[in-house]
Regions:
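Active-site beta-loop-alpha junctions enriched in small/polar residues
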Residues: 13-15, 61, 85-89, 123-125, ...
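Conserved Radical SAM active-site core
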Residues: 1-93, 99-115, 283-321, 333
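N-terminal [4Fe-4S]-dependent radical SAM core
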Residues: 1-9, 17, 49, 222-268, ...
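Surface-exposed cleft-lining segments at the edges of enzyme active sites
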Residues: 88-96, 124-134, 175-184
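Short, basic, low-complexity termini and linkers enriched in Ser/Thr/Gly/Pro
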Residues: 317-343
C-alpha cells in the first residue's frame, strides 16, 4: 500500500454514507480497505492514508447520518466531493428514501462546502404508467427551484434495464400494477431538452450520464446545451483542490461513460435502500441481510471479521513472497552486473 495516489469512489456499489459510516471511519483509522473484485473475486487492499488519496468521491441518497463524519474527514486533511441522488420518483420506486431530508441535507452540504462540491443526480428517469412527461416536468421544476443557488450541475440518465432490473420491474407490474414504458430516443431527447431549459432557468447545467445521443440531441435550436457527464471527474477535483494542475486518466466503467479512473471500495448486494431500479442488488432480502449482519470491524465491507482477517493474511503472505522474489531478481541482476564490470 502507499505506492500510488488514487481517487477513491465511496461508492457506486452501495450507499456507504447512509448505512456504513462507522465501517468507513474504521477503515480510515486503520489506513486501508479490502476489496473483493465483483468479477472474478480477486481480493486486494487499497491504502486510505491521506497521502495516498487524491480525493474521495462520495455517493449517497442520504448524507444525513454522515455529516459529523465529514467534519472529521475534512479535519484529517482529505479532499472530497459529492454525488447526491435526489430523483423525485414516487415511493413505489424508492420505498426507503426520505426525499425532504435529502433536499435539506443537500442544502446543508452546499452551505458547508460549496455548490461546486455537489453533483445533483436526477437519476434515473423511468418512464412508466405513473411517471410520464408531465410528471417529470413538474417534479424536476420543484427540485430545480429548491436547489437554485445550491448546485451548479445536474447529472441524469434514463434507466438501464439490466437483467436484474427487468426482473424487479416485472415484479412491480405484477404486485403494484405499475408498467414501465419503453420510449423511443426522440421522446427522450425532447424531454431531456425540456429539463435542460428548466435547469438553465435556475442556473443549473445539465449533464447526460452514458447517453451521448442526448448531448447531440441538445443541439436543437432554442434549447440549452446538455454536456457529457463525468460522475467521477478529474477536472472537478482539479478545479476544487489542485489549482497547480492534476494528472488523471479517463477510465470508463461502461459504454459512453466519461469517468476518470478510480478505485471503488463498496460491495454489491449490501444496500438496504431497496430501490426497484437498482443494478447493484440481486434482491432486497439479500441486501437487508447483508446490512443487518455487517461487521464494522471487517476490512472488507459486507464480510465477516473472520473472513476479512483470513484474506488479509493471505494477501500479506502473497505480498511477502512477491517482495522476496523481486529482491532475489534484483540481487541476481546486481551480481551479474558486478561480474560484467570486472576486467
Amino acid at each position: 500500500m502507499g505506492e500510488m495516489k488514487r481517487i477513491i469512489s465511496v461508492s457506486r456499489r452501495t450507499d456507504i454514507p447512509a448505512f456504513y459510516g462507522n465501517w468507513f471511519m474504521n477503515r480510515l483509522k486503520e489506513g486501508f480497505a479490502g476489496i473483493v473484485h465483483p468479477f472474478g473475486g480477486r481480493k486486494y487492499i487499497v491504502s486510505l492514508k491521506p497521502e495516498d488519496v487524491v480525493c474521495f468521491v462520495f455517493w449517497s441518497k442520504n448524507f444525513g447520518p454522515f455529516l459529523e463524519n465529514l467534519r472529521i474527514i475534512d479535519d484529517l486533511g482529505y479532499k472530497f466531493y459529492f454525488n447526491y441522488t435526489v430523483t423525485g420518483l414516487p415511493s413505489v420506486f424508492e420505498s426507503n428514501v426520505e426525499k425532504q431530508l435529502a433536499i435539506e441535507t443537500l442544502k446543508q452540504l452546499s452551505r458547508t462546502y460549496s455548490p461546486r462540491h455537489i453533483n445533483w443526480r436526477f437519476d434515473p428517469i423511468i418512464i412508466s404508467s405513473i411517471c410520464d412527461r408531465d410528471f417529470y416536468i413538474k417534479a424536476f421544476e420543484q427540485l430545480a427551484s429548491e436547489f437554485a443557488g445550491y448546485v451548479e450541475r445536474c447529472y441524469f440518465s434514463y434507466v438501464t434495464e439490466y437483467n436484474k432490473v427487468k426482473v424487479n420491474f416485472e415484479k412491480l407490474q405484477k404486485t403494484k400494477g405499475v408498467r414501465i414504458v419503453d420510449c423511443g430516443d426522440d421522446f427522450k431527447i425532447q424531454l431531456a431538452n425540456e429539463l435542460a431549459a428548466i435547469a438553465a432557468h435556475y442556473g443549473i447545467q445539465m449533464y447526460s450520464c452514458c447517453g451521448d445521443y442526448l448531448v447531440e440531441g441538445s443541439r436543437k435550436e432554442g434549447y440549452p446545451r446538455i454536456k457529457k457527464a463525468h460522475c467521477i471527474d478529474g477536472s472537478i477535483i482539479e478545479s476544487l483542490f489542485f489549482p497547480e494542475g492534476l494528472q488523471y486518466t479517463k477510465k470508463p466503467t461502461r459504454k459512453e461513460c466519461g469517468c476518470t479512473e478510480s478505485t471503488d471500495i463498496g460491495t454489491y448486494d449490501t444496500c438496504p435502500h431497496g430501490c426497484v431500479y437498482c443494478y447493484a442488488n440481486v434482491n432486497k432480502r439479500k441486501a437487508y441481510q447483508a446490512f443487518s449482519n455487517h461487521d464494522k470491524d471487517s476490512a472488507f465491507l459486507g464480510y465477516s471479521k473472520a473472513e476479512s482477517d483470513r484474506w488479509l493474511a493471505e494477501i500479506q503472505k502473497s505480498k511477502f513472497k512477491y517482495q522476496n522474489y523481486i529482491s532475489k531478481c534484483k540481487s541476481s541482476v546486481l551480481t551479474h552486473d558486478i561480474g560484467k564490470d570486472k576486467p
